[in-house]
Regions:
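SAM-dependent methyltransferases
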Residues: 176-182
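Nucleotide and nucleotide-moiety/phosphate-recognizing core
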Residues: 1-145, 153-165, 172-175
Length: 182
């Protein structure tokens, strides 16, 4: 699941999913890396204005702009009930799909998340689907306007040291610096 909605205030309101780096949208970096790992079931939580390739499922919280936790709940509602694991990514971390092998190796309890620059990157994680669902939609009702950190606080998460692959791009300056490293 890729979160690709939001207002992107620190990007000047530009859709993060559509920000180009070297001729490719941030979202497309993730989709291409998932395809390279034979991940074929992908849900993107994004408004209709974000173009998705054929075969990629779209979801969006209702009403929109309820925050990332509401987006996660909306994305989970689209998943097949038998899905044991959910890879959760944010479109502003364009290389994060490359963390999947390390996250899978680190998964012990409820999930494994990237640890980068002194922080747990909760939107770069591999989660046990039912545990994630219980955290973001207790009682089947998706939470809104709550931080991801607070919603996932009760989960037993393993941290996985990850290099710059988990870098998230919050400003146009971040995008420029990241592009220079590619």
């Amino acid at each position: 699941m890729i979160l690709a909605g939001g207002t992107a205030r620190r990007m000047g309101g530009i859709s993060k999913a559509d920000v180009p780096i070297k001729g490719k949208r941030l979202l497309d970096y993730l989709l291409d890396d998932l395809a390279a790992q034979q991940i074929t079931s992908v849900t993107v939580v994004a408004p209709p204005s974000v173009q998705l390739p054929p075969g990629v499922q779209r979801s969006l919280e209702d009403p929109p702009l309820g925050g990332p936790v509401a987006g996660i709940a909306a994305g989970l509602a689209c998943l097949h009930p038998a899905k044991e694991l959910t890879l959760l990514l944010s479109c502003d971390a364009p290389l994060a799909a490359r963390c999947l092998p390390a996250l899978a190796n680190a998964l012990i309890h409820d999930g494994a998340v990237a640890y980068h620059e002194g922080y747990r990157q909760l939107l770069v994680g591999l989660y046990r689907t039912e545990k994630l669902r219980g955290a973001v939609a207790p009682g089947g009702q998706g939470l809104r306007d709550i931080s991801v950190k607070r919603a996932l606080a009760g989960l037993d998460l393993t941290t996985c040291p990850i290099t710059w692959l988990a870098t998230d791009l919050d400003t146009l300056g971040d995008v420029e610096n990241f592009a220079a490293q590619l």
